[in-house]
Each structure stands twice: as C-alpha cells, then as structure tokens.
Amino acid sequence: MIEIIPAVLSRNYEDMKNKIALVRGILPVVQIDLCDGIFVQNTTWPFSTGGVSDINFQRILNEQEGMPFWEDIDFELDLMVADAVSNFDIYTKLAPKRIVFHIEAVGDLNEFKDFIEGIDVYIRDAIQIGIAINTTTPIEKIFPLVNSVDFVQCMGIEKIGFQGQIFDERVLNNIKTLKEKYPDLIISVDGGVNFEIAQKLIEAGVDRLVAGSLLLKAEDIRETISVLENLV
C-alpha cells in the first residue's frame, strides 16, 4: 500500500502544532518543511521566527520538550535550507525519523557522499536519509548517491517551498528512469499531488506520496487518505 505523508509548511510553532494535530491519530509520519528563505524563497518555522533563537526551537534543542505530539507521530524533516550539511547535528536534535537533503543545496556531491557515509552509526541507524531532486535538475545527477541513501524524493513542482503549486509532468520520466535503474529504490514524490496525479504516480511506481493542501485543506482527511490508499 502507498504511504501517505502530510506536508506541513508552518508560519510559526503554533501553526505547525495546529496542522500536525489535524492528522494526529490518523497518520504515523508527518513531513515538516523547513524553509530558510535562502535556498528557497519561502520562510517557515523556525526561520520565520528567529531561527535557532526561536524559543520553542531552543526548548527542543535543550531537550526541555519534544516536537508537537512526538509520542504519537514520527517526523520527516525536509531541509529546504542552505545549511543542511553544516547544521546537520542541530537538525538531528529534533529527533526525526527521516531527514531529506536537497541535491541542489549540498554543494560538492563527492564531499556530500563522504559526509553521508561518515555519519555516526548510531545516528544512521536511527534516522533514514533521503535525497531530493528538483524537476529542473538532470536525474542522472542523483545516481552516484543512490546507494548511500535510504530513499529518493522527487519534487513534483518546479517552485519548491510553496504549497498549492501545479504538478510538473517531468517528474514522471524521472520516476521511470529511477525505477528502471534501481528497481528496489524507495521513491517519494512531494508537491502537486491531487487524486488524478496520485493515480499516475502510483502507476509509475512511487512508494510514498507527500501532500500538503490535498490533505490539510480536505473537508474529510480520513476519507481523502482512504481514497489515496485505495488507488491502484
């Protein structure tokens, strides 16, 4: 069955908490989109409220509290930030299940591969590492990294960091290419997902669908999830 993951873009901590609450007890994993206003134009928590100095962010880093509803939900951090590698240790303190790096933001790919393969074994066992790729980046660029990560996230929209964008059909060819070359690779698609697009993505072999507006603005989230999970 396809895995459905809600994507949360948050103006501030309370906004994030309220959006996560919508799927609490319904879905086990939520993707938190962290946007720094540098790698992408949009800015989300904690960068929109002071960055590392944000009081809630500080409380989590100091282990005074956890992420909202951390006892019920696992988190996938989508690092749409310029400092993903240099501040990796900080992001791990949010206790994510998965972390997604963006290939366009990590710099030299050989150095990044060395970084991934050099992550402490304890951390690597606890956190799945994914690499995201934009529709405008040649899919071949990701090939050298595939065997060093746990999954690939294909962005389904050209302007990342924003929700409600139109799906970019180029991602379908990227998925096809990846599945042909790496049949066992877990592929996630983030952005532009609606029911019609979801059907195409599942037929193309996608394992995970990451959706923001489709889920969080749905009149009935449970029904929306049920429809997506039963697409074949």
Regions found by a protein language model. Give the residues of each.
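Glycine-rich phosphate-binding active-site loops on the catalytic face of alpha/beta enzymes
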Residues: I99-D108, Q153-G164, A204-I225
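Conserved, mostly hydrophobic/aromatic
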Residues: V23, I32-D33, Y91, V152, ...
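Glycine/Thr-rich beta-alpha phosphate-binding loop at enzyme active sites
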Residues: V40-T49, T135, K141-K176, E180-Y182, ...
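Hydrophobic faces of well-ordered beta-strands that scaffold small-molecule active sites
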Residues: I2-V8, V30-I32, I73-L79, I99-F101, ...
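Alpha-helix-loop-beta-strand connector modules within alpha/beta enzyme cores
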Residues: P46-L77, F115-T135, R170-V193, V227-V232
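Hydrophobic, well-structured mid-protein blocks that either form specific transmembrane helices
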Residues: S86-E140
